[in-house]
């Protein structure tokens, strides 16, 4: 179970990105975080796995406090958090197979990881997952040869091979066309359900959130203004979430202020 308690993030500029955010994600539920650009959605997801350091508050994964860990212990807990990025976060010059197997770096020594020497069982599992996400036969293609939808499927495969306790997903459809977006969401929720892994999903498109999530968390100005079922998300609550009028709750997606992807492989 993921537990977030009173999380707060204030940037050096003084901007408050998160203000007393608390939530839990458990079982095999899919929880979608919605809100306008700048509401703190990406910051929340990245604070959970410490890609962004929170100012205060705590994050727990099962009985382990993530926020209290020293840097050298972070690889072990990140291994339990499958992260799927908005901009894919693939190593462009590496093959599809090599990118997927990077999800196993937390399970091998630094030397083996550097030489990309993985146990045969990991390789076999990677082939199985690639077939599952519809990329069979592309394992030797470089990542920079793939379409956006294919790249996101590689990201999903990499997260799944980690055998995570939770999947953290940051705007998985923002760079995709509507049809590909639905294909990716179908795949993501199907695999998460089959694996019995909960999903915390930051997503801009409210329609997709309502269709695919079990629960909605609405953020506005860094605070939770709604946490409940998809059925309970009515027009009044949407207006409360998007009250600043910066964008329509069900408009086409626009990018949240940039948070640079960490392109290092986290072990």
Swiss-Prot record:
GO molecular function: ABC-type phosphonate transporter activity; ATP binding; ATP hydrolysis activity
Chain segments carrying region Disordered: 243-267
Keyword GTP-binding: no
Signal peptide: none
Principal EC category: translocase
Any Pfam family the entry gives: ABC_tran
Entry binding sites for ATP: 35-42
PROSITE patterns (alphabetical): ABC_TRANSPORTER_1, ABC_TRANSPORTER_2, PHNC
Record note on quaternary structure: The complex is composed of two ATP-binding proteins (PhnC), two transmembrane proteins (PhnE) and a solute-binding protein (PhnD).
Function: Part of the ABC transporter complex PhnCDE involved in phosphonates import. Responsible for energy coupling to the transport system.
Protein's UniProt name: Phosphonates import ATP-binding protein PhnC 2
Species in which this protein is naturally found: Natronomonas pharaonis (strain ATCC 35678 / DSM 2160 / CIP 103997 / JCM 8858 / NBRC 14720 / NCIMB 2260 / Gabara)
Lineage per the UniProt record: Archaea, Methanobacteriati, Methanobacteriota, Stenosarchaea group, Halobacteria
């Amino acid at each position: 179970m993921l537990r977030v308690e009173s999380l707060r993030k204030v940037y050096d500029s003084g901007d408050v990105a998160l203000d007393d955010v608390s939530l839990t994600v458990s079982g095999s539920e899919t929880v979608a975080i919605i809100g306008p650009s700048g509401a703190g959605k990406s910051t929340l997801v990245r604070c959970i796995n410490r890609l962004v350091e929170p100012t205060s508050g705590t994050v727990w994964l099962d009985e382990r406090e993530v926020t209290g860990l020293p840097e050298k212990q972070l690889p072990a807990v990140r291994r339990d958090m499958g992260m799927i990025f908005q901009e894919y976060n693939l190593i462009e010059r590496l093959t599809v197979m090599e990118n997927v197997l990077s999800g196993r770096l937390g399970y091998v020594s630094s030397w083996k990881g550097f030489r990309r020497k993985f146990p045969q069982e990991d390789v076999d599992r990677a082939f199985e997952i690639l077939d599952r996400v519809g990329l069979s036969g592309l394992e030797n293609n470089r990542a920079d040869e793939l379409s956006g939808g294919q790249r996101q499927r590689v990201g999903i495969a990499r997260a799944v091979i980690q055998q995570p306790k939770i999947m953290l997903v940051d705007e998985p459809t923002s760079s995709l066309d509507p049809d590909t977006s639905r294909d990716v969401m179908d795949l993501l929720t199907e695999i998460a359900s089959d694996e019995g892994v909960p999903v915390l999903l930051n997503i801009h498109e409210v329609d997709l959130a309502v269709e695919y999530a079990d629960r909605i968390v609405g953020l506005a100005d860094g605070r939770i203004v709604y946490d409940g079922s998809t059925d309970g998300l009515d027009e009044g609550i949407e207006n409360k979430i998007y009250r600043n009028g910066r964008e329509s709750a069900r408009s086409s997606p626009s990018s949240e202020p940039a948070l640079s992807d960490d392109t290092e492989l986290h072990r």
